[in-house]
Amino acid sequence: DAGGTTAQASIALIQQVWPYVTDEVAAQILAGTAFTDFAGFDPDVHGLGVIDIDQALLPIGELRMPLDGREGTRAINGEIAGVNFGSFDNVTAVDSAGRGFDININSMHTPDIQNNWYDVALTDSITRMDYNFDYVYSEGMLNYSPTDESGNFTMGLRDIKLAKGWYLQGQYTTLADRNPWFHMSGMWGTINSSETIETVVTHVKDKFMFNMGNMHTTTNFDSGLVTNVTPIDSVWGEISWRNEGLRLAVGSMPYVVKGDIDVRLPSTIDSQGIVHHDTFNFEIENQFATYSSVNYANSFRNINYTLGAYNNTLGFYQAQVKLNLAF
């Protein structure tokens, strides 16, 4: 149908759903859906034309995430991983006409993140942050990796003697553009770098070695929906037995015990069209897992070789063979 009465009723329906939409904006929305390509169309007679009210109740243009008040919007894109949102899924977005719509962001967040520590048991290093680097050098008590092209860097001291059979290791690590515990992009925010201070207490007795480590990670980031990231604390432990070239080990992979983020999300739009946000707190978490490994190193004539195998309770298995030919 067409005409003034139908148009006014349609405007009233739009304003019933979105009270803050003005008559002018509502008329523009309806005009965008009106069908006028029919014989004899006369705006003085038919008004806006044949209105598709169902179409008028759908979003116009791209849905975007509103900022505080009516100060602007941001594109709905990106993801966040390593954070447990629980059952939280719906937020408010706005279309190009400024109308609010509930959207589901379930596909844009996940508590799972690729584990950074799978290769931990296939090396002989004591500190765990080493496993974010391809090469780490040890010279005396110094443990380090030169700054790479991305700006990643690690350096620390090892084998600081505390008492008979007890040692302390300390490591400082900078990772560019990432945090080892969670990831975010797009509307959530951007991680510029993370800094981790790791301390490890080691006890050696006969052929056994016990390591207990703690990592304290801070995050430098540009905020988006994420407005705050607290320091992240994680712990790990390992016990190993070595006899000449054979090394057996069991342990726990680094596990987050403390750390969370604040996320400011649009929740409602009031009758004046003002967007209201709520701040939610979500925990950074990973799955607790244990591992076991075996490594054997020996030589035959002028060939040095190493055999290694590793598995963890996350279902990951790995084996490797290294051969070095000495001339």
Name the predicted role of every residue range:
Residues 1-12, 16, 20:
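Extracellular S/T/G-rich loop segment that most often corresponds to the catalytic His/Ser-adjacent loop
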Residues 2-6, 45, 181:
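Substrate-binding/access-modulating region of protease and related hydrolase catalytic domains
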Residues 16-111, 115:
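C-terminal subdomain of the subtilisin-like protease fold in secreted/lumenal serine endopeptidases
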Residues 97, 104-216:
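Outer membrane beta-barrel translocator domains of Type V secretion systems
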Residues 152, 168-171, 175-191, 196-202, ...:
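Outer membrane beta-barrel transmembrane domains
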Residues 243-245, 298, 315-327:
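Outer-membrane beta-barrel "beta-signal"
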Residues 308-314:
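A short, acidic, flexible beta-alpha connecting loop/helix-capping segment that sits on the rim
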